[in-house]
């Protein structure tokens, strides 16, 4: 199976993530205070996860296209993760594997692309600029590099506003699985201009 350098392709849009270190923020916020012990304890518990996986539904909506897929995400910090996108029939549309020495993406034709920067690769392959570094943390319900966020009445992340270059990303959380320890999101939405990305996590497995 050939290995190709990254080039522009019409591929299924991908909302994948990269692991990045988390830090305590001094944000602009409303609602529950981000310096509260409850929020600080929650962040610490999330950051202490040694392994997790989740599966669910992914949707990308813009003025020009609508795409949906099932996804499976498996992460073993600090830099090993796998993201698999499949169509409704269960066939692979796109697979991303990341390790400390690089990133490999396989498309639905079996072609492989290798590189070092997953965020750059996804932008080149799909034509979409997605904040992958921060999405890795947003999917877990922590704010990443964002300094503007709000908490709900349970001291869980409710909204995030993040500026990346000339793009403003707004993230909103619709629901959490509070039976998990720590509680983790089950539905969130990212909006940037006319782009809208929806993620629904049907289940989580954490260690």
UniProtKB/Swiss-Prot annotation:
GO terms under biological process: lipoprotein localization to outer membrane; protein transport
SUPFAM superfamilies with a match to the protein in the record: Prokaryotic lipoproteins and lipoprotein localization factors
Subcellular location: Cell outer membrane
Residues making up the signal peptide according to the UniProt record: 1-21
CDD domains documented for this protein: LolB
InterPro entries: LolA/LolB/LppX (IPR029046), OM_lipoprot_LolB (IPR004565)
Family indicated by similarity: Belongs to the LolB family.
Name of protein: Outer-membrane lipoprotein LolB
Gene designation: lolB
């Amino acid at each position: 199976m050939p290995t190709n350098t990254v080039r522009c392709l019409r591929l299924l849009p991908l909302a994948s993530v990269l692991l990045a270190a988390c830090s305590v923020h001094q944000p602009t916020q409303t609602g529950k205070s981000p310096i509260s012990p409850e929020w600080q304890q929650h962040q610490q518990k999330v950051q202490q996860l040694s392994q997790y996986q989740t599966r669910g539904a992914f949707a990308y909506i813009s003025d020009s296209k609508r795409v949906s897929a099932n996804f499976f995400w498996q992460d073993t910090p600090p830099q090993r993760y796998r993201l698999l996108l499949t169509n409704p029939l269960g066939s692979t549309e796109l697979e991303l594997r990341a390790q400390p020495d690089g990133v490999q993406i396989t498309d639905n034709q079996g072609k492989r692309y290798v590189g070092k920067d997953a965020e750059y690769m996804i932008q080149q392959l799909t034509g979409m600029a997605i904040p992958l570094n921060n999405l890795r943390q947003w999917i877990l319900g922590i704010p990443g590099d964002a300094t503007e966020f709000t908490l709900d009445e349970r001291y869980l992340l409710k909204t995030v506003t993040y500026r990346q270059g000339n793009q403003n990303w707004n993230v909103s959380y619709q629901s959490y699985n509070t039976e998990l320890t720590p509680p983790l999101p089950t539905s969130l939405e990212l909006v940037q201009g006319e782009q809208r990305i929806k993620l629904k996590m049907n289940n989580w497995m954490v260690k």
